[in-house]
Structures are given as structure tokens and as C-alpha cells.
């Protein structure tokens, strides 16, 4: 399957795994937002610390605005291969197009590490 048009760079599997781990930890010890509408609001309000987006979302238009909006607000984001994994990490039994960490809780160190790696990828 070809990469969706909104995925502008490749994210290493290690970074994807760390992002999902951080999301699970933040879900249990901090606060997260699930779903494209909630994540969009969190980005616009500047409260999102890390945004995680599924690459296999259809139609693409559902999440196509997330990377540009995140760049505009200088919020790091990571793409993961499957929205089913993202849903599971978010505490859902179904897939989830996007999730955001709003309060990292005990995942702060992981979020900081992911942010540094994201900055290096963007450079």
C-alpha cells in the first residue's frame, strides 16, 4: 500500500513503538484526547504535547489537516502504521485515527525523548 499523501516523512518503528508506549502511560497517569475532533481542538488550543496519527485512515481527508496544524502550532507528531494499534494504546477496543497526549503524567521523559527525535527528523 502506498503512503497516504499527508505522510510527509518516514517514522522509524522504534519511534512509533515509543509513541504508543507513551500514549498508554499517559492514558493511565495523565490525560489524553482520542479522535480527530478532540485532537484538533487540543492542537488549536495549544494543549497537546504529542500527537499520534494512524497511517491507514480512510478516507485520508479525516486526518490530512493534522500534520499542517501541528506544524503551525509547533506540536510534535508521529505516524503509526495501524489505527487499530493506536486505538488499543488509547484504551479503545476499536481503531482510532488520532490521539494526543495532553498531560504526559509519568510519560514525560518519553514524550521529551520523542520530541527530540521528531525535531531531528524534521531537520
Swiss-Prot record:
InterPro entries: eL8/uL1-like, Ribosomal_eL30-like_sf, Ribosomal_eL8-like_CS, Ribosomal_eL8/eL30/eS12/Gad45, Ribosomal_eL8/Nhp2, Ribosomal_eL8_arc. Disulfide bonds: none annotated. One of its GO terms (biological process) is translation. It is found in: Cytoplasm. Keywords: Cytoplasm, Ribonucleoprotein, Ribosomal protein, RNA-binding, rRNA-binding, tRNA processing. GO terms for molecular function: ribonuclease P activity; rRNA binding; structural constituent of ribosome. Transmembrane segments: none annotated. Coiled coil: none annotated. It comes from the Archaea. Multifunctional RNA-binding protein that recognizes the K-turn motif in ribosomal RNA, the RNA component of RNase P, box H/ACA, box C/D and box C'/D' sRNAs. Part of the 50S ribosomal subunit. Probably part of the RNase P complex. This is Large ribosomal subunit protein eL8. The lineage of its organism: Archaea, Methanobacteriati, Methanobacteriota, Stenosarchaea group, Methanomicrobia.
Amino acid at each position: 500500500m502506498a503512503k497516504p499523501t499527508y505522510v510527509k516523512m518516514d517514522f522509524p518503528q522504534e519511534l512509533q513503538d515509543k509513541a504508543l508506549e507513551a500514549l498508554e502511560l499517559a492514558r493511565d497517569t495523565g490525560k489524553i484526547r482520542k479522535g480527530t475532533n478532540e485532537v484538533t481542538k487540543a492542537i488549536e488550543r495549544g494543549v497537546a504535547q504529542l500527537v499520534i496519527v494512524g497511517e491507514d485512515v480512510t478516507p485520508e481527508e479525516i486526518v490530512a489537516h493534522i500534520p499542517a496544524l501541528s506544524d503551525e502550532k509547533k506540536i510534535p507528531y508521529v505516524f503509526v502504521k495501524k489505527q487499530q494499534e493506536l486505538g488499543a494504546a488509547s484504551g479503545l477496543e476499536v481503531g482510532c485515527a488520532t490521539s494526543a497526549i495532553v498531560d504526559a503524567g509519568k510519560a514525560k521523559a518519553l514524550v521529551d525523548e520523542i520530541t527530540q527525535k521528531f525535531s531531528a527528523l524534521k531537520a
